[in-house]
């Protein structure tokens, strides 16, 4: 049986179709989910894609968090369903309290769009098992509100429990994708929940799945092959 991975479309989503294509390339079946529907159509996992849902009014992800579909996503995530939040999806996950912390405006107050160097910190989640811990990858990044923040106690907890999933790689030229692009505390690019089934990150793996587009690399494809293997072997 083919694994079914749902992709939610909110008003203002930009990358839902790209995410569906990435899922298909990985060998799973993408399933379109609408923000007004509570029915997840018997999917095995869910992706909240990037974009500017509801125009980022009030706060990025704050309105989407109350969409009817999110009631079911929150319930299922707490029961163990794998959920991935990409960019705006990450913002929604923090607003829904499925992941700790919050996303604020970039420290330089500008929209940023570039290829970004990341280091895999946790390769034991539902979405990262096809990577190796310490592996460095290139993933496109595009955001205005990408600065991850949390209080020191939460940051220390994430570090101690190995819940920092990805970190921006510093120490090189920005033109080569190095550096913290938005002022995220402790260079955090992505985190996971305690169970490892919910992951959020700001960069866009769905834009790095084919060699002819994006970075010219396929460094984002393991997100989708990781979850496929987990679902098939469950």
Curated annotation (Swiss-Prot):
GO BP of this protein: 'de novo' IMP biosynthetic process
EC number: 6.3.5.3, 3.5.1.2
Localisation: Cytoplasm
Domain Glutamine amidotransferase type-1: residue ranges: 4-234
UniProt keyword Ligase present: yes
Principal subcellular localization: cytoplasm
SMART domains xrefs: GATase_5
Pathway participation: Purine metabolism; IMP biosynthesis via de novo pathway; 5-amino-1-(5-phospho-D-ribosyl)imidazole from N(2)-formyl-N(1)-(5-phospho-D-ribosyl)glycinamide: step 1/2
Name of protein: Phosphoribosylformylglycinamidine synthase subunit PurQ
Organism: Streptomyces avermitilis (strain ATCC 31267 / DSM 46492 / JCM 5070 / NBRC 14893 / NCIMB 12804 / NRRL 8165 / MA-4680)
